Amino acid sequence: MSMIDSSKFVKATKTAFVFPGQGSQKVGMLAELAEQFSGVKETFAEASEAIGFDLWHIAQSGEGLNQTEFTQPVLLTASIALWRVWLELGGVAPKYLAGHSLGEYGALVAAGSLSLGDAVKLVNLRGKLMQDAVPQGAGAMAAILGLDDAKVVELCQQVTAQENGSVEAANYNAQGQVVIAGATAAVEAVMSLAKENGG
């Protein structure tokens, strides 16, 4: 097990923290860090008490970890646990806080705009609503890399017009990286066309 040496932190004047969105979860995450910092499990206990189920158990066992209603509160709690470890170690206070999708809630908690307890309740509800909106396996998302945004939109329109189900550009992550979302068959069809077009 390796210990964290806070003396190696860069003393930057402009630091930003960007909290991750869904998809960054892994069974057993933060287990090693929890052995070094009691605040990790304390953060999970605080969030678990607010939400009414054991988030640490889900993170460590993987039971339900890929169900959105559980994934989101676990990831939010993990982000805040890491944030608190950073502060405990005397890490530089960031000038900017941001988050990608679900990570926006982590940024709000870190900024003191939202309590962890309220935030885990919100993201649990958010996850339930997302899960209910599309039955398991009926919908999908995928990142298309290496194509112009307009080409991705064109491919989505082409597939949707062929009645393979609806698919749309859902998120423009960066130049040449567009996330698409829609019916599973339609997303797969766009992915296939994207590969044919050099994506």
How would you label these PLM feature ranges?
Residues 2-6, 84, 128-129, 165-167:
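A generic local structural motif
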Residues 62-63, 98-102, 127, 139-143:
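Short, glycine/charge-rich beta-strand/loop segments that flank catalytic centers
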Residues 100-108, 113-114:
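Glycine-rich nucleophile elbow surrounding the catalytic serine of serine-hydrolase chemistry
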Residues 29, 72, 109-112, 133:
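Short, function-defining helix-loop hinge/capping sites that tune catalysis or transport
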Residues 75, 82, 107-109, 121, ...:
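Hydrophobic side chains within alpha-helical segments
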Residues 4-98, 180:
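Helix-rich "cap/lid" substructures immediately adjacent to catalytic or cofactor-binding pockets
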Residues 23-24, 49-51, 111-199:
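Alpha/beta catalytic cores of group-transfer enzymes, especially the acyltransferase/condensing modules
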